[in-house]
Amino acid sequence: MEITGTILRGPDLEPVEGRVIVDDGRIERIEEATTESTDIVCPAFVNAHTHIGDSIAKEAGGGLSLEELVAPPDGLKHRLLRQASREDLVDAMRRSLAFMHRSGTAACIDFREGDVAGVEMLREAADGLAVDAVAMARGSIDAMHAGDGFGASGANDDVFDEERAATREAGKPFGIHAGEGDASDLDPALELEPEFLVHVVHPEPRHLERIEAEEIPVVVCPRSNLVTDVGVPPVEDLVERTTVALGTDNVMLNSPSMFREMEFLAKLSDVPAREILRMATVNGADLAGADYGPIEPGRPARMVVLDGDSDNLAGARDPIRAVVRRAGVDDVREVVSSA
């Protein structure tokens, strides 16, 4: 397979004109050459934080607070999940995953409610789709063993010492929501020595220093934070200190579109477009433990090809800014998957 156009090559997403040669699902080489193609070849996206279980309840709960919406065990989301049938939950999740694939997402890191059964539903929903659904289970240690890691709701919600120890012993990642509504759960979350934190909207200087010193990655979800009215994460400060990835959070609140998340962050912050695209691709892939990420020889071929001559993108002078600030699912010409 040969893909031509402007290639966003390597971890620095360097735009080069040429072709990507793919053989047996892997990138064999990248050749710089003049080409007539106007396509933009970008690493596939990795949505680093989702809750796709609430795909059954899109746009439910308008006007509710964060706690009323999602706090376990009786936030609106959790009540709706309990009321829904297994068939409806799996079908709704599958449709969200199908949309992710169509919009160029290769993987999502899903905080999976529902204990062992929830992990099994996610596996069923993803079966046969070219999206790697990483199950960060919750509810029990058994769920963690059934899934790919443990995704804790927050250190103010429960004590997670046993789950943390079991996850470490199993050699799996432990992630936790922290600093979303306020700073009160950041210290206990950091004491758990997580592989990554989610949200970190309200860090104090000491939290930022510790995140930097301990090299703890952070996933930010700015659209979700605005919807739930908890504030805006200090993304510029976080990017200076650690690896930052990008997620869309609950499907009930936001579409799982990395295009929308990137554009929103680009226009909300002063973070450069190249760094935002790295957050949505390379950094997320690292967090997911995926072999893909940068477009470079030897990597699995997971790319999204955008039509640079679409009515939306034609005339763009900067391909990285075009992808981050302007592109959308309608501009996707092809999703290349080695899965």
Where are these regions (language model features)?
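C-terminal cap of metal-dependent C-N hydrolases
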Residues: 8, 300-339
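N-terminal cap/recognition module
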Residues: 32-64
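Active-site core of metal-dependent hydrolases
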Residues: 141-234, 239-252, 271
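Alpha-helical scaffold segments that flank or form the walls of functional sites
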Residues: 40, 56-128
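Divalent metal-coordination and catalytic microenvironments
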Residues: 5-6, 20, 25, 49, ...
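His/Asp/Glu-enriched, well-ordered alpha-helical/loop segment
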Residues: 191-192, 234-312
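Short, acidic/polar
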Residues: 85-99, 136-143, 181-186
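N-terminal metal-binding scaffold of metallo-dependent hydrolase/deaminase domains
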Residues: 1-34
